[in-house]
Amino acid sequence: MTDQTLEQIFEQQFGQSSTHRFFAPGRINLIGEHTDYNGGHVFPCALTLGTHAVARKRDDVVFRFYSLNFEDDGIIEVAGDDLTPQSAHGWANYAKGMIHVLREAGYRIDTGCDILIKGDIPNGAGLSSSASLELVIGVLLDKLYNLDIDRIDLVKYGQQVENQYIGVNSGIMDQFAIGMGKAGSGLLLDCETLDYTYAPLDLSGYTIIIMNTNKRRELADSKYNERRSECEAALAYLQQYRPYASLGQWSMNEFETVSFEDERLERRARHAISENERTLQALDALKEDRLEAFGQLMNASHRSLRVDYEVTGKELDTLVEAAWAQPGVLGARMTGAGFGGCAIAIVEDDTVETFMTAVGHAYETEIGYPASFYTATVGDGAREVEQEVI
């Protein structure tokens, strides 16, 4: 679907032409999983897949939302003075949430608007379709209402939508990667301080492949919040030994001197701490052009997520183990929260087709339904895009 078609559909649905167009990417996390809410480091990048929006301000206080991904929902109309979450509004709650959070922060959004959304991120695949929607609405509101929002503040508002409005206790990585992404670069983020560094991703001769299990995962209904609680309990136990504010401040050398009474909490903490160290090592490996070492760190990350953090499951393990068995694979791991969703692999360019065929066959044989495969391109963060046909 071209952007011109989006404009035509906007006019069909809302009766007037749109005035602005916006895009926010999805994201993958190359390494650093379940570290963001533990005060550690993550290493995500923005994708060229994402969420498109076209919009127009209104003269009244009504907000109208329409998504081509949920056409059966029709136009969702909301009064500007009633932005409380409603289950019947589904996806539109993320848009309502951003309006609500910005108003609460003191930004003036005194009239309504019409918004048409089209996402090309598979919903529920773990590529941050919800954070992409939050950020495309954020940049849209910033432009339409001349709010002049600092970009890192906008990232934080996106997280507030997730945490306080939707009720999912997520970290800040997804919104940060989507708001701050840069084409051709990964982004090393310290989730404790929000210090960040761009790292050029020179994967010449290799392709990033996203492997979707096609097993839906609902973050709010998964064991995600349970893992957060377990990490908080593990940190409280560890604070008897060192007064660190987060697991991300611990080193593995320090951790290995501690005896745990609860083996489950020990494993959860071991993952958070070791994964943080792997993420920093991965940045060094990329800087030094040691791609094989980077791939080995990806593999170790998946093993830790499987054994110590227990967030992979049969589908993700089947994909990743099949990927490891193929020639020309630097590394492979699950990405995102887990419990289904996606894995990623870095594969030699000339083996991409045979890789997808072989892994797809192994997966469908074991699981009983097919996986989906996408080649990923690293793109820029959330932004207004020009009003030209592409």
Swiss-Prot record:
Molecular function per GO: ATP binding; galactokinase activity; magnesium ion binding
Location of this chain's protein in the cell: Cytoplasm
Catalytic activity: alpha-D-galactose + ATP = alpha-D-galactose 1-phosphate + ADP + H(+)
InterPro entries: Galactokinase, Galactokinase_bac, Galactokinase_CS, GalKase_N, GHMP_kinase_C_dom, GHMP_kinase_C_sf, GHMP_kinase_N_dom, GHMP_knse_ATP-bd_CS
PROSITE patterns tied to this protein: GALACTOKINASE, GHMP_KINASES_ATP
Swiss-Prot/TrEMBL keywords: ATP-binding, Carbohydrate metabolism, Cytoplasm, Galactose metabolism, Kinase, Magnesium, Metal-binding, Nucleotide-binding, Transferase
Active site (catalytic residues): 174
BP terms from Gene Ontology: galactose metabolic process
Residue ranges of the TM segments: none
Main subcellular location: cytoplasm
Pathway noted in the entry: Carbohydrate metabolism; galactose metabolism
Family affiliation: Belongs to the GHMP kinase family. GalK subfamily.
Functional summary from the UniProt entry: Catalyzes the transfer of the gamma-phosphate of ATP to D-galactose to form alpha-D-galactose-1-phosphate (Gal-1-P).
Protein name per the record: Galactokinase
Organism: Exiguobacterium sibiricum (strain DSM 17290 / CCUG 55495 / CIP 109462 / JCM 13490 / 255-15)
Top-level taxonomy: Bacteria, Bacillati, Bacillota, Bacilli, Bacillales
